[in-house]
Amino acid sequence: MTNLNPRDVVIVDGVRSAMGKSKNGMFRNVRADSLSAELVRALVARNQFDVNEVEDLIWGCVNQTLEQGMNIGRNIVLLADLPKTVAGQTVNRLCGSSMQAIHTAAAQIATNQGDIFIIGGVEHMGHVGMMHGIDLNPEASKHYAKASNMMGLTAEMLGRMNGIGREEQDAFGVESHRRAWAATQEGRFKNEIVGVEGHDANGFKILCDIDEVIRPDANLEAFKALRPVFDPKGGTVTAATSSALSDGASAMLLMSAERAQALGLKPRAVIRSMAVAGCDAAIMGYGPVPATQKALKRAGLSVADIQTVELNEAFAAQGLSVLKGLGLYEKQDIVNLNGGAIALGHPLGCSGARITTTLLNVMEQQDTQIGLATMCIGLGQGIATVIERV
């Protein structure tokens, strides 16, 4: 068992919603803030602690407008019936937003600026489109290629640079769905998914506790039949090898080790290290490589020490490129064992805490000790978190 110092940052618990399709999906009548509040209530109900001690609720969200606007973090505090004395903020590091929420809370705990934090993230891509209201600076093209704003083209670039062809991408995508559906059937998501009321295709209310985006019938023949979507003439990236558009939320409970101990709560993991890094916007998907290298160095570890990995699958070409860059290409049996974003979707602000929660559950299922959660970020960034079970 890991010996903990008083100001070590521990993960007490983590939950998420099921992932809903963004187009006419099960959460089409559920707001992003309401979905998030349901998770906060569940997190509080699952763990015995005084909510008056919560310092801050930190929520990741990318497109902060419409129902996701006006500091959705504070709105979630009020909707979840937390005490009015609990603060709330919203953070944005694009795809890495809710992992940044982890890092922000962890930094505050480590520096004695609070003992208990609720963090998480949400994105309702069906209600608030990824590019809704976006007005990019025309002068930006003087500083980086305009195509860098098109995530699919950055994936095409990585695929070409790393020799990852269409066949390999298709196989990776099919495997993501296979793993996710197997995890669903075997109940491996039960500890992390909180059922939230939504609607079925006929408009009847249902409890949504199974990921709607997974395709149980995913197969190579169907994937091969699809045309490239971003580079029609010579491309390799298709809709099936890209992360699905989905709606979802995630939440985690972080504490100082000393406060968790005083409350009699058993931590599930301790955060060993954290890092962010920048890279060329044209290959934004490569960001997890420098971010992970930084995080490992800070933890005094090497890639060989990592036993379980959750890598956000923005695209198959991107995920495979990162695995090559990190020396994990031949170790895909420790990466995304319950499937990844190609099967589950990538609700932007939700994904960081989602993959960290999934990582924690997979580590418990596999009885591994040290794990890595990492993801790429649009316009050329990466973020990484190393955790250790306690």
From Swiss-Prot:
Gene Ontology molecular function: any one: acetyl-CoA C-acyltransferase activity
Broad class of enzyme this protein falls into: transferase
GO biological process, one term: phenylacetate catabolic process
Pathway: Lipid metabolism; fatty acid beta-oxidation
EC nos: 2.3.1.16
Family designation: Belongs to the thiolase-like superfamily. Thiolase family.
Protein name: 3-ketoacyl-CoA thiolase
Species the sequence originates in: Acinetobacter baylyi (strain ATCC 33305 / BD413 / ADP1)
Lineage start: Bacteria, Pseudomonadati, Pseudomonadota, Gammaproteobacteria, Moraxellales
Name of the gene this protein is made from: fadA
